A protein has these predicted regions:
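Carbohydrate-binding surfaces of carbohydrate-active enzymes
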Residues: 58-59, 70, 75, 88, ...
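An acidic-aromatic loop/edge-strand motif
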Residues: 142-145, 149-150, 156-200, 643-647, ...
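Acidic/aromatic-lined carbohydrate-recognition and catalytic surfaces
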Residues: 94-207, 215-217, 226-229, 233-237, ...
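Short strand-turn-strand beta-turns centered on an Asx-Gly dipeptide
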Residues: 851-858
């Protein structure tokens, strides 16, 4: 049972924050006791892979622009999603794209209005009829906020004013205070250049008549520092009509509950007794939120001392205790987020019988363990060799017992809009799979009002994955590939050997006013070397932190057990501060035979301003015993370039590739009956490797996520400790290998080697019809549509037709024939501002559906650009028909770009369309060469 299911069963009244946290921890402990998901036989696993369940389908973020929506168009788009293999959507109301215009049927329904709620209600009912999952963003745009958030409940910040003290001044005026602001304290400090002299900071308490009064005879240059409890003033980003306003104070429980009562309860009126599957909270982007009005009181209660005299430590170095003070401030920020935002949000979702899906990272400072409050953790970002939100989310799922981890996928994919291809989709999705993701939330599906000029509405900074793309003809096939992998990567349990410790205390210690982005600071603390070293030595890992260790961690023999996961190696990346109980647990782990590695340095400090001398001595002495001297049982790697070598000497890799191929990644899951590996080539070059798997006593099979078929793997060697398999991976190619003990069919003995017929070239004289009603033309040589002025800006589908006469000798027994469209060519990678793209010139631009003798054979949209046609060819005449689709971008490039002047005058500038200078026509069609290629087949 996952925590998701368990939370659905908890129908209690809203508890207090402490009781809620206790109930949550109890739920986590119950899940740990329950252990892994129920056993599944290899036959059942294969059956599910062939026909994966609907809940493994990709979903889409459905942007409702305005929202200028109508029932007819909403239903049409939902039916299109269903036809495209998309399993559901998340409704996100965002900014308008047209002013109200009755002549065009455009009416923007104000957010939370009766008309808007009625549209939601209609979609709720219709989505259930269609079998589509519906999630709902609990607001408009992001972060949470709007006109219902008064300034007193808006996001808080610590405002600091630093003024140089003029010579012979007796006083300075207090800075102007606006609504919601309060002066906390004033300090003076001597300066040296641009820096404050650490031991010179003194509080100024003589404040009256609108000024702070200074002592006489100050020596040297000075600054005066004013600390003000303030508001960020941040407005909701990309709001719908009627959703404009301040961003919510995420560190104020009363403000959170007011928001949920006003917005959440109103939205739930659309659903009645059938709530959405989940409500969604986007990534925490409450920029500069590092304070709340009662922070000083809360800090004193939690940390045991008054922060007020030490406020300058948050902006400057005031001495040896500076980082300890910042650590305490940061820890308090995280605690307040957990208790005042995440707890009431989680409890509200439970009361409304729905799940909480959330991107739980950013600002305010969410920790990895903050995901204990989330039913469905979600990440984003395809960067698989750094600390990124997708692996952050999957690690949380692994620790807290969730089988499903989603990611916001394809954000910024191959900008500009309508430039992304099916291959781009696959390549990025594979990277998310490598990070442990198994539910893709596409970013996204733009609603388009009826009558809007092709190619319709689009989000300002994203790809589009609706039917406006001509390549939509292969969307069901792309979606099925992703669905099969999403299903398979949910089965059993993750099989990661390494646990990578996140030093929260070090991250908090490096917070400064206005810079409290937890995951980014942790990324800097972990550094650029550790994650690649783990992955490139053939291992995989999860992140964890101190609170996760306390909640779900224990030592069992030589393993650190976190939830249902057993880790054989713990890595401490450059850790300076560590809680005594954490280090004590690591000491127990090493004593029982586990492997503990520290990089760069050994921990030396107990965290916090009030850490005692005994605690400091305990950390110092324990760390020395573990990592220093001849009797050290831990391992210190000062130069992280050596980490891979050390790790290899201490842990047999799960998978290795020969030759070494850092561009190849893998993820491993295990069931009671099978070992499941997904392997992906993340590069634009083919990779031919020998893969050695740390699996014994099992037979490997190749499971094809494109077709659902299984076949015997190319086993090179079987030993008592490993299985060696040959893999030939195309550019951006992927494979699934499943190891089990079931007997494989024996290969039939070869009774003779049939002669392989010579290739047949099909690159000339195709009849090509653009669109549905155009007159066919003869293309004597294959060329891009953009080379002809008449089709340069054509976006759509063209049908290529040709008849081929095959001699009887071309199809002898034992021969497999493929229709080959040519090889892809790598192009040099270029730095990108954001997002990703594939770096490949494909021979098919961008997708093709192949028919032989009027029978659909399949589609071609990624390497290898070929398709097996053995069973549909016949001696004599054969009719080949290939429907080819390109990008909507080409049509856009031949038209004026949208003019948002009147829109901006009406509603203000709520977005800026990105990369419009890159809206240029790109090659389209079949570029060839096209051949029929025959090869000997090996059939079992």
């Amino acid at each position: 049972m996952s925590i998701t299911r368990l939370m659905r069963r908890l129908k209690t009244k809203a508890p207090s924050p402490l009781r809620s946290a206790g109930a949550l921890q109890m739920a986590v402990l119950i899940l740990v006791a329950l252990g892994p998901a129920s056993a599944q036989s290899i036959t059942e696993l294969q059956r599910g892979f062939e026909r994966p369940p609907d809940d493994a389908k990709i979903m889409m973020r459905w942007w409702w622009f305005g929202p200028a929506v109508t029932r007819a168009e909403l239903e049409r788009e939902m039916r299109l999603m269903k036809e495209g293999g998309i399993g559901g959507f998340e409704v996100q109301p965002v900014y308008p794209l047209l002013p109200d215009d009755p002549t065009r049927g455009i009416k923007n329904l104000p957010f939370l209005s009766d008309e808007f709620i009625d549209a939601l209600r209609f979609v709720s009912v219709k989505s259930r009829e269609l079998g589509l999952r519906m999630d709902l963003t609990l607001g408009s745009g992001w972060p949470f906020g709007g006109p219902y958030v008064p300034i007193s409940e808006a996001a808080g910040m610590l405002r600091t004013e630093r003024l140089k003290l003029p010579g012979n001044s007796s006083h300075l005026p207090i800075p102007n205070l606006t609504a919601g602001e309060k002066l906390l304290a004033v300090f003076r400090a001597r300066t040296q250049g641009q820096s404050i002299v650490a031991d010179s900071v003194r509080e100024l308490t003589d404040i009256h008549d609108g000024a702070v009064w200074l002592p006489e005879n100050l020596e040297g240059p000075h600054e005066v520092l004013f600390f003000i409890s303030s508001r960020t003033g941040m407005q909701v980003k990309r709001p719908a009509v009627g959703a404009e306003g301040y961003v919510l104070n995420h560190l104020d429980r009363v403000a959170t509950e007011h928001y949920l009562n006003h917005v959440g309860d109103r939205l739930m009126q659309a659903f009645g007794s059938n709530p959405p599957h989940a409500v969604f909270c986007d990534s925490l982007e409450v920029y500069n939120q590092d304070w709340t009005s009662d922070f000083l009181e809360e800090f004193k209660q939690r940390r045991g001392y008054d922060l007020k005299p030490y406020l300058p430590a948050l902006v400057a170095d005031i001495g040896p205790k500076t980082l300890d003070i910042r650590r305490d401030w940061g820890k308090t920020l995280t605690e307040l987020l957990n208790q005042r935002f995440l707890t009431p949000l989680h409890d509200w979702a439970r009361r409304n019988h729905t799940l909480l899906r959330m991107q739980d990272y950013g600002v305010p400072a969410a920790a990895l363990s903050s995901n204990a409050y989330i039913d469905l953790p979600e990440g984003e970002g395809p960067q698989w060799k750094i600390l990124r939100a997708s692996r952050w989310a999957s690690s949380a799922s692994h620790l807290y017992g969730h089988q499903v981890t989603s990611s916001e996928t394809w954000t910024w994919l191959h900008s500009p809009v309508f430039r992304a291809t099916p291959l781009d989709m696959k390549a990025e999705a594979d990277l998310h799979f490598l990070e442990g993701i198994n539910q893709l939330i596409g970013h996204g599906w733009p609603y388009t009002a009826a009558g809007v000029e092709y190619p319709g509405w689009r989000f300002y900074a994203s790809a589009v994955f609706n039917e406006k793309n001509p390549w939509w003809i292969v969307m069901p096939d792309v979606a099925l590939y992703l669905q099969r992998l999403s299903y398979l990567l949910r089965q059993g349990q993750p099989a990661n050997d390494v646990a990578l410790y996140l030093p929260n205390d070090d991250a908090w210690a490096h917070f400064t006013a206005g810079n409290t982005h937890m995951i980014e600071i942790l990324r800097d603390r972990v550094g650029p070397n550790v994650v690649p070293a783990i992955l490139e030595t053939g291992n995989d890992f999860d992140f964890f932190d101190d609170d996760a260790l306390r909640q779900v961690g224990r030592v069992d023999k030589d393993a650190l057990v976190l939830g249902a996961n057993h880790y054989r190696v713990i890595i401490l990346p450059g850790v300076e501060r560590i809680p005594p109980d954490t280090l004590q647990k690591f000491e127990e782990f090493v004593h029982n035979g586990g492997t503990l590695i520290a990089t760069r340095n050994i921990p030396q400090l107990a965290p916090g301003f009030r850490a005692t001398e005994a605690e400091q001595r305990q950390i110092h002495d324990t760390a020395l015993q573990l990592f220093a001297g001849l009797s050290a049982t831990g391992h210190l790697v000062r130069d992280e370039k050596e980490l891979g070598t050390v790790l290899n000497s201490l842990l047999k890799p799960d998978v290795t590739f020969a030759p070494a191929s850092p561009q190849i990644g893998f993820i491993h899951r295990k069931t009671s009956d099978a070992e499941i590996y997904f392997v992906a080539n993340t590069s634009n070059a083919p990779q031919n490797v020998i893969a050695s798997f740390r699996v014994q006593g099992m037979q490997p099979e190749l499971w094809d996520p494109f077709s659902g078929r299984t076949s015997r793997a190319n086993v090179r060697l079987l030993t008592e400790s490993q299985t060696v398999v040959g893999l030939a991976l195309e550019p951006y190619g992927s494979r699934v290998l499943v190891f089990s003990k079931r007997a494989l069919p024996k290969t039939s003995p070869q009774t003779g080697q049939p002669a392989v017929p010579a290739p047949i070239d099909l690159s000339t004289d195709w009849r090509v019809t653009f669109g549905d009603n155009a007159k066919p033309l003869v293309m004597d040589q294959l060329r891009s549509w953009t080379e002809n002025e008449a089709t340069k800006y054509f976006s759509g589908r063209a049908t290529y037709e040709k008849e081929v006469n095959l001699p009887a000798g071309f199809l002898p027994p034992g021969i497999t024939v493929k229709l080959d469209f040519g090889d892809a060519k790598p192009i040099p990678e270029q730095p990108l501002r954001s997002g990703m793209q594939t770096w490949l010139e494909a021979p098919v631009r961008e997708a093709a559906v192949v028919y032989i003798n009027d029978q659909r054979v399949g589609s071609v949209w990624c390497p290898p650009y070929s398709i097996d046609v053995t069973n549909v060819l016949r001696p004599g005449a054969n009719r080949i028909r290939t429907v080819v689709a390109n990008l909507a971008l080409n049509y856009m490039s031949g038209r004026p770009l949208p003019d948002y002047r009147l829109l901006n005058l009406r509603y203000g500038e709520r977005f800026q369309a990105q990369d419009m200078d890159k809206v240029l026509a790109v090659p389209a069609g079949l570029l060839g060469p096209i051949r029929l290629l025959a090869n000997r087949s090996s059939k079992p």
